[in-house]
Amino acid sequence: MKQYLDLLRHVREHGTYKEDRTGTGTYAVFGYQMRYDLSQGFPMLTTKKLHLRSIIHELLWFLSGDTNIRYLKENGVSIWDGWATPEGELGPVYGEQWRSWKTADGGVIDQITEVLKEIKRNPDSRRLVVSAWNPAVLPDPSISPDANAAAGKQALPPCHCLFQFYVADGKLSCQLYQRSGDIFLGVPFNIASYALLTLMMAQVCDLQPGDFVHTLGDAHLYSNHLEQADTQLARTPGPLPTMTLNPAVKDLFAFTFDDFTVSNYNPDAHIKAPVAI
């Protein structure tokens, strides 16, 4: 994916060194946008192998409204383990904000369901927005992620914090605003995850997939990922794979792992890099 490699190269060449919460240090730029035409293939990196199983299960977990990592662990996904309480709780993170945003009067808003209804009812709406950024439940930075979760706050503030859908010419597009992007490890997952969400939403709304637009705020490369980034930049991207969804599924919340099939995915070898916690 040239778009992603261009981002990696841009930050490698122009990033400003900054200290960060984890103490690792980053090279960062502020404000960067990529666009992927989903009719041209599924945007999953070919210059290193991605763990698609984790991407799919995490998205299904978000959409279920769950905030405990039990489902992920049962399906061999460990990407959230480092922030959860011993009981597996993460506090009111993505799933709760997407599906059960708490209101001041004691009610809840299912943002995903409301947006689905609005796409079908009024596809020209400019309000097809889902937000995970809820200041009332942001974590206290002076205590650990698991302590925040135990106190009813988010273990981590949402990195991919707001997305918007757009319908034109029978196609559904999605734009994600990501306030903070770990370019080497996190961003490739985010691209594939939101591209997949767009395919799913398009199918259940009887639309064709359009573009996935990815807007990054603080786009950063951790200082202990520089060698890995250079390794990836030396590789040549191959053709994008194809993602096929079970056409019988017409309910967004009825998708299961077995409803997704990726074909023609022939990536280069995985590149290992440490996670900054």
Swiss-Prot record:
Residues forming the catalytic site: 159
Q: Name one GO molecular function term.
A: thymidylate synthase activity
- Gene3D superfamilies, per database record: Thymidylate synthase/dCMP hydroxymethylase domain
Cross-referenced SUPFAM superfamilies: Thymidylate synthase/dCMP hydroxymethylase
| CDD domains, A to Z | TS_Pyrimidine_HMase
Q: Which UniProt keywords apply?
A: Cytoplasm, Methyltransferase, Nucleotide biosynthesis, Transferase
Q: Which GO terms describe its biological process?
A: dTMP biosynthetic process; dTTP biosynthetic process; methylation
Q: Where are the transmembrane segments?
A: none
Compartment list: Cytoplasm
In its keyword annotation, does this UniProt entry include Phosphoprotein? no
Q: What is its pathway?
A: Pyrimidine metabolism; dTTP biosynthesis
Give me the residues that bind dUMP, please.
21, 126-127, 179-182, 190, 220-222
Oligomeric state and interaction partners are given as: Homodimer.
* HAMAP family cross-referenced by the UniProt entry: Thymidy_synth_bact
- Give the protein's function: Catalyzes the reductive methylation of 2'-deoxyuridine-5'-monophosphate (dUMP) to 2'-deoxythymidine-5'-monophosphate (dTMP) while utilizing 5,10-methylenetetrahydrofolate (mTHF) as the methyl donor and reductant in the reaction, yielding dihydrofolate (DHF) as a by-product. This enzymatic reaction provides an intracellular de novo source of dTMP, an essential precursor for DNA biosynthesis.
What the record says about family reads: Belongs to the thymidylate synthase family. Bacterial-type ThyA subfamily.
Q: What is this protein identified as? A: Thymidylate synthase
Q: Which organism is it from?
A: Alcanivorax borkumensis (strain ATCC 700651 / DSM 11573 / NCIMB 13689 / SK2)
